[in-house]
C-alpha cells in the first residue's frame, strides 16, 4: 500500500501540472448569493461532464437549410441517428481514464453527459477548485466560482456542471398570486364573460380556432416540461374538462433525472404544471399530451443511505434536453412548451451556449421548442453581476436562445394590448440571428426614437438576439383554472406559452393530415411567410428596472434603477409582444400552402 504521504502526493499530482486551463470563471459571486461555508472534503457531490459535440459551427447553416421556406430541403427533418452522424459527441475514453486515475468509479453515461459521483475533496483536487455552500433566500447550493481541466481534455469537454451556475430558478406562473374563485357553471364566450375571465371558449374566439377538429390519430403530439418539483394533476384536469365540457382525455408522464409524479394534493406542487396541461388541452384536444418531469437531484445517489446536501444541486437544462435528444423522433412530441427561466446573466455563457445548441438540435429533428419569455418586463435585477455593478436591462434565458421560440404576453380582451410584465429585450450572449434581421432593424430604425435608442444603448445590446418572437394572452383578465379541485384564476407568460403550443399542435395536425412534415424550428417561418398570420399588437408597453419585481410586486434589494425604462408595443416586431398574437385560421392556410 502507498503511504499516506505518497498517496497525498499522487492526488496532488492530478491537479498541479495537468490542470492548466481554466474552463470557466466567475468574476464575483452572483448577486443575491452568500458564501455560507466551505464544503467538507467528505461531502458527496455528483457532477456531469458535458462532452463536446463536433461540427456545431455548422448547426446554424443546417437549420437555415431545413427551416427556411422555399428551400428544396425545407421540412426534411433529421432523426436521432442523423444528428449523431452530423454532430458526433467527442470520445469519452480520455475523460474516463482521467476519472479512473482519480479513483472515481461511480460513472454513468446519459447522452453526451458523463455523470459521476465523488467526494468534494476529490473534486477540489480534480478541478483545482474549492466547492462551497452558498445561500440565496431558502435556496442553498454547492458551487464554486471557477474550475480547471487538463489541457489535453479541452477538445473533449465543453463544461462541468453544476459548478459555476448559481441561477435563481423561477417559473413564469403567477401561482403564488392564484386567487380562489367560487364554483361557476360553464359559460359561452361573450364579450362580458371574456372581459372577466379567460376560458377555453374565449381562446377559440380570440385566436380564431373556429370549428377546427384535430384528429387524435394524426401523429401530432404536444409536450410540456415540469421542473421545481411540479407535476400536473390527473384529477384536476378531469375537473377542468368537465367544467368546460371538453371531452375527457388524460396525459402521459415521463420522468427524467429522478423526477417525481406527485398526485397527492396535500404534498404536490401543481400551480405551473396544471396551468400548462389545462391550457394545452383547452386548445388542442384531443391531441395526445405528454408531461416531462425533470427532477433536480443527480442521476443517481452516490453510495449513501440518505441524501446529502449535495444531492439536490443539478439544474434541469442539460439533463432535460439530453434525455429528449436520446429518444427517436417517433417517441417525441413535435412541439414542447417550457415555462422556466433564469436571468441570462446568472447562467454562465458556456452553459447557455451548450443548452442553446441542444435546443437547435431539437429543431433539426422537427420539434418546435417554446419558452415563456418571463414575467419581469424589461428586467427586475437590472444590475450586472460581474462585479462592476452597472445598471443594465435583464434579458431572460432560455428565451434569448435564437433556436427557441419565445412567447411573450398580452393583456385585456377585444382588443389585446401588451402586458406590462411581458419579458423582452436583447440578449447579451447571442447575436441577432439571420431570420429576424429585417424585423429588428425595422423596429430600431422606425419605432424607437434616436434619443431613446442612444439612452438605452448603455443598458442593452441592440446587436443581440431580440425576444420574444410571438405572444398570447397572459393576464388581466386572468385564466380560469382548476387547482386541488377548486377554481382559481392564474396567468403570466407561462399561460401564453402552452396556449401557443396548443396552436402549433393544431397546425402540425393539419400538415400531417395533408401528408406534410411538422413545423420544426419555427422562427425562420415566423419572420417570413407566417408573419401574415399574426394580429399585430400596437398598444401597451412593458415596465421594469424601477426597483420593483414586476412578477411579485416586491422590492428588489440592490436592484438597479433605470429611469424611463420600458418597451413599447409597435407596428411589426417589438420586444414586448414579438410579431403579435396568432390567428389560427390564417396560419393554417399559410402552413398548408408550403
Curated annotation (Swiss-Prot):
Gene3D superfamilies: Peptidase S8/S53 domain (3.40.50.200). It catalyses: Release of an N-terminal tripeptide from a polypeptide. Ca(2+) binds at residues 536-537, 572, 574. Binds 1 Ca(2+) ion per subunit. One of its GO terms (cellular component) is extracellular region. Its main location: secreted. Residues 197-594 form the Peptidase S53 domain. Secreted tripeptidyl-peptidase which degrades proteins at acidic pHs and is involved in virulence. This is Tripeptidyl-peptidase sed4. It comes from Aspergillus fumigatus (strain ATCC MYA-4609 / CBS 101355 / FGSC A1100 / Af293) (Neosartorya fumigata).
Amino acid at each position: 500500500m502507498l503511504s499516506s504521504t505518497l498517496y497525498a502526493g499522487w492526488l496532488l499530482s492530478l491537479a498541479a501540472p495537468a490542470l492548466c486551463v481554466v474552463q470557466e470563471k466567475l468574476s464575483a459571486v452572483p448577486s443575491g448569493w452568500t458564501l455560507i461555508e466551505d464544503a467538507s472534503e467528505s461531502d458527496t457531490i455528483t457532477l456531469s461532464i458535458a462532452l463536446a459535440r463536433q461540427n456545431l459551427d455548422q448547426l446554424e447553416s443546417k437549420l437555415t437549410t431545413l427551416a427556411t421556406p422555399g428551400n428544396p430541403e425545407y421540412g426534411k427533418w433529421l432523426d436521432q441517428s442523423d444528428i449523431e452522424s452530423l454532430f458526433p459527441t467527442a470520445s469519452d475514453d480520455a475523460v474516463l481514464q482521467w476519472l479512473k486515475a482519480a479513483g472515481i468509479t461511480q460513472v454513468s453515461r446519459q447522452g453526451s453527459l458523463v455523470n459521476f459521483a465523488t467526494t468534494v475533496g476529490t473534486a477540489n483536487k480534480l478541478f483545482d477548485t474549492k466547492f462551497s455552500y452558498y445561500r440565496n433566500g431558502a435556496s442553498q447550493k454547492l458551487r464554486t466560482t471557477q474550475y480547471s481541466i487538463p489541457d489535453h481534455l479541452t477538445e473533449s469537454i465543453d463544461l462541468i456542471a453544476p459548478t459555476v451556475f448559481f441561477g435563481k430558478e423561477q417559473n413564469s406562473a403567477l401561482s403564488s398570486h392564484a386567487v380562489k374563485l367560487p364554483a361557476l357553471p360553464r359559460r359561452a364566450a361573450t364579450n362580458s364573460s371574456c372581459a372577466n375571465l379567460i376560458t377555453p371558449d374565449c381562446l377559440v374566439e380570440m385566436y380564431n380556432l373556429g370549428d377546427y377538429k384535430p384528429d387524435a390519430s394524426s401523429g401530432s403530439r404536444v409536450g410540456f416540461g415540469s421542473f421545481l418539483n411540479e407535476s400536473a394533476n390527473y384529477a384536476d384536469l378531469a375537473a377542468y374538462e368537465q367544467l368546460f365540457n371538453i371531452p375527457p382525455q388524460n396525459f402521459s408522464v415521463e420522468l427524467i433525472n429522478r423526477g417525481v409524479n406527485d398526485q397527492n394534493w396535500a404534498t404536490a406542487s401543481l400551480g405551473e404544471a396544471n396551468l400548462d396541461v389545462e391550457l394545452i388541452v383547452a386548445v388542442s384536444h384531443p391531441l395526445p399530451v405528454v408531461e416531462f418531469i425533470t427532477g433536480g437531484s443527480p442521476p443517481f445517489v452516490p453510495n449513501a443511505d440518505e441524501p446529502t446536501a449535495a444531492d439536490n444541486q443539478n439544474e434541469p437544462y442539460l439533463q432535460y434536453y439530453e434525455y429528449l435528444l436520446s429518444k427517436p423522433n417517433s417517441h417525441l412530441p413535435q412541439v414542447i412548451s417550457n415555462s422556466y427561466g433564469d436571468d441570462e446573466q446568472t447562467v454562465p455563457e458556456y452553459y447557455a451556449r451548450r443548452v442553446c445548441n441542444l435546443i437547435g438540435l431539437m429543431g433539426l429533428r422537427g420539434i418546435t421548442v417554446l419558452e415563456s419569455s418571463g414575467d419581469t418586463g424589461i428586467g427586475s435585477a437590472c444590475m450586472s453581476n460581474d462585479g462592476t455593478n452597472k445598471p443594465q436591462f435583464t434579458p431572460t434565458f432560455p428565451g434569448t436562445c435564437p433556436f427557441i421560440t419565445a412567447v411573450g404576453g398580452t393583456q385585456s380582451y377585444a382588443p389585446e394590448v401588451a402586458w406590462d410584465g411581458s419579458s423582452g429585450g436583447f440578449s447579451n450572449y447571442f447575436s441577432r440571428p439571420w431570420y429576424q434581421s429585417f424585423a429588428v432593424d425595422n423596429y430600431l430604425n422606425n419605432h424607437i426614437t434616436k434619443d431613446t435608442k442612444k439612452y438605452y444603448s448603455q443598458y442593452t445590446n441592440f446587436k443581440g438576439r431580440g425576444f420574444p418572437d410571438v405572444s398570447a394572452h397572459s393576464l388581466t383578465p386572468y385564466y380560469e383554472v382548476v387547482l386541488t379541485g377548486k377554481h382559481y384564476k392564474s396567468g403570466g407568460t407561462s399561460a401564453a406559452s402552452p396556449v401557443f403550443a396548443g396552436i402549433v399542435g393544431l397546425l402540425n395536425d393539419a400538415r400531417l393530415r395533408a401528408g406534410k412534415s411538422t413545423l420544426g424550428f419555427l422562427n425562420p417561418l415566423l419572420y417570413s411567410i407566417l408573419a401574415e398570420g399574426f394580429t399585430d399588437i400596437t398598444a401597451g408597453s412593458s415596465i421594469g428596472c424601477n426597483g420593483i419585481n414586476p412578477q411579485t410586486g416586491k422590492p428588489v434589494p440592490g436592484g438597479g434603477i433605470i429611469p424611463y425604462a420600458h418597451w413599447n408595443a409597435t407596428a411589426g416586431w417589438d420586444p414586448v409582444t414579438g410579431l403579435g398574437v396568432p390567428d389560427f385560421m390564417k396560419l393554417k392556410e399559410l402552413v398548408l400552402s408550403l
